[in-house]
Amino acid sequence: MAKGLLMTYALWAFGGPVGLHHLYLGRDSHALLWMLTLGGGGLGWLWEFWKLPSFVAQANGVQSWKQRPEEERPPLSLLRFASQMVVGVYFGLVALISLSSTANFYIVGLPLAVGLGVLLVAAVGNQTSDFKNTLGAAFLTSPVFYGRPIAILPISLAASITAQKHRRYKVSAVSETLSVRLYRVGLAYLAFTGPLAYSTLYNTAATINYAAETLGSFLSWFNFFPLLGRLVESVLLLPCRIWWLLVGAPGFNSSQFQEWEKLYEFVDSFQDEKRQLAHQVLGIPEGATNEEIHRSYRDLVKVWHPDHNRHQTEEAQRHFLEIQAAYEVLSQPKKPRASWR
């Protein structure tokens, strides 16, 4: 049956963040992705407004793209590659929070979670990728940074590159009933949310503490890249801020939600901690004016520029990078701390 554009827009408006319009159009992988990420943090859902006509046309012309020659490859998409990276990291963080206590987690659980996240994005729309090669790349990369949360990044990168290398169009498949499709999507959704829900509800304090440690370790790798660090912090805090926007009155009553409030405050506190460290690096007191910051930065750069310290190049390079990062942090206007009360 032909799909209607008006119905698609209606489902997008009223159930878009959970992928109702994608279920209607037969894009089950896209629907599952939206369910697990709330429409890509809301940004992907809004961006789709302009893409819905092409989605409907694709759904109505499903036979044409399923009959493409197998040797034809889809064009390379940087957006899809970046999405694979982000979702792979997201799946890895969820696995770290909910499954890290299991045996051989960093060799089996983590690469499996990251690889499945990458494959989910690879299967969006009329494309897919090679299951074995993508997961194989994830498992082969798992020993890099073994035992550390930062291991998520090389695993996700390797899996995303492999998925792009083996990208292809989906082949023709037998049409399935809606109940069968919903059953399969539901099982996948429960497989993702079940361990996380159990860990959260039955061991809330330990889960929050581990989440805080994991996020702290993960964010510490971005100290020398303040702009990227702020972007990562914003992405991590986005679900909390969306919840705050929806409920209207910040603050939680139950003890479990109060624990999550502490996690929000922990991640949000990185902004103040980075500014304090930046003041120490530049040797200026807190509350220093922009002129004082710039003067101290200029003086320190002259002292520690690698070209002026050829006898101690490595130490000079380290100090020079720290000074650059500190100046970049203090050059940005301080954001007001969000209050939950």
From Swiss-Prot:
Gene3D superfamilies: DnaJ domain. Pfam families: DnaJ, TM2. The keyword Chaperone applies. The keyword Aminoacyl-tRNA synthetase does not apply. It is found in: Membrane. It is a multi-pass membrane protein. It comes from the Eukaryota. SMART domains: DnaJ (SM00271). SUPFAM superfamilies: Chaperone J-domain. GO terms for cellular component: membrane. Residues 277-341 form the J domain. Residues 4-50 form the TM2 domain. Keywords: Chaperone, Membrane, Transmembrane, Transmembrane helix. May function as a co-chaperone. This is DnaJ homolog subfamily C member 22. It comes from Rattus norvegicus (Rat). The gene is Dnajc22.
